[in-house]
Amino acid sequence: MDSFFVEGARVWLRDKEQLLPATVSSCSHDDGTLVLTADYGEVVYVQQSELNRDKVFAMHPSSILGVEDMSSLGELHEAAIMHNLNLRYQKDNIYTNIGSILAAVNPYKLISGLYSPAVVDQYSKHHLGELPPHIFAVANECYRCLWKRHDSQCVLISGESGAGKTESTKLLLQFLSVMSQNSGGTPPSEKTTRVEQAIIQSSPIMEAFGNAKTVYNNNSSRFGKFIQLHFSQSGNIQGGCITDYLLEKNRVVRQNPGERNYHIFYSLLAGADRDLREFYFLSAGPGAYHYLSQSGCVKDSSLDDQHLYTSVMRWGQAFETRT
């Protein structure tokens, strides 16, 4: 029997078409039976006649300990990548590099201090790779490359529904706004500050008209968007635009069971005062309207429709004041 098959050894177990991380629970030198416990709870008995490199093999030390950059893994296969992400996720390390690519795992909870002003300041003073993986490291590298390469930069954020693309976009804009305000050692002009605020604070209104509850995500973006920022030679944000595309128009008239129409309709009914409701002939709650209740879901405990209405109106009033 191979020397690495000792009690407590970390191995890969091939189960049908997939590899599972497992631990050697015990091994019998008499009949050669190997008892493995997969990380997901399954107990597997492997006979001596079944032992071969394709069935069970040792886990590389880099996979046992986990790495910040998966390009340095000693074994590159799907199971090793997923296992490394899971190891870091269990320690609230939701960011992992893959070379110059950043992989983010949505923790579905708040992680204290992960995006604090102190963290923003820390990443603004270091190059990519000098600190642990973080979305601020990507944003900082993008900002630095504007001046280092004298060329436009692009950050592509992609992932499945609920992966955290919308929140990641907000964090990128937050970091770039801070860098803009601190650039050149001089305070930004009033016009520059207004531009930054308009871009960053546009999120509530974009989400209200373009996001909806789906079975996978309670705040799912049902459209794509391209955000373009223009920087001055001094490093300040001078202007920008948001282009939306591929809006899921059919959601307005039909939703799948358990899903909702766009947030704006529910927030309007929840937050508008009596005069505004009467002006638009809105005399009932969302359950009374077919296009808002046909899916059987008009309310979700994780969504505050009244608060969203307040945020949208606050943004709209602030925008009117600026213009």
Regions from the PLM with identified roles:
Residues 2-14:
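Short coil-to-beta transition motif at edge beta-strands of beta-rich domains
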Residues 4-6, 21-31, 36-323:
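N-terminal switch/interaction subdomains of large nucleotide-dependent motors and GTPases
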